[in-house]
């Protein structure tokens, strides 16, 4: 499934109009329409906003979406997607941090859970800020 199809599917499943979603996501109706028609691609920030409008995680929004013929199935590690979805901790994690954290791996191992991801985020933020 392509991203624009997934976006339209999410809206249709919920019985929402373009106007409803655009208002909650604070984007224009024409822009949302272009996204759903595949005429333009959203930024990570827009994906986070749309995921919030649908009350799902970005991971869930992208689940099964294909990019360049490859599926995003399991694109973000579960613990990281749990951290992003956390209503208290998630808003602290900017799109840049999501990209940075999603690349962390050493000898095939990644942090195990939400708490591990959060500790790594805090340490890196302290060191790099």
From Swiss-Prot:
Q: Is Signal one of the keywords UniProt gives this record?
A: no
Going by the UniProt record, its keywords in alphabetical order are: DNA-binding, Repressor, Stress response, Transcription, Transcription regulation
Would you tell me the protein name for this molecule? HTH-type transcriptional regulator DdrOC
Q: Where is this site: Cleavage?
A: 106-107
What does the PTM comment of the record read? Cleaved between Leu-106 and Arg-107 by the IrrE metalloprotease after exposure to radiation. Cleavage inactivates DdrOC, leading to derepression of the target genes.
Domain HTH cro/C1-type: residue ranges: 7-61
Give me the positions annotated for DNA binding: 18-37
User: What stretches pass through the bilayer?
Assistant: none
Organism domain of life:
Bacteria
* Function, as annotated: Repressor specific for genes preceded by a radiation/desiccation response motif (RDRM) site, which is present upstream of several radiation-induced genes.
The encoding gene: ddrOC
Where does the signal sequence lie?
Answer: none
* A Pfam cross-reference name: HTH_3
What Gene Ontology terms describe where this protein resides (cellular component)? Answer: cytosol
Species this protein is from: Deinococcus deserti (strain DSM 17065 / CIP 109153 / LMG 22923 / VCD115)
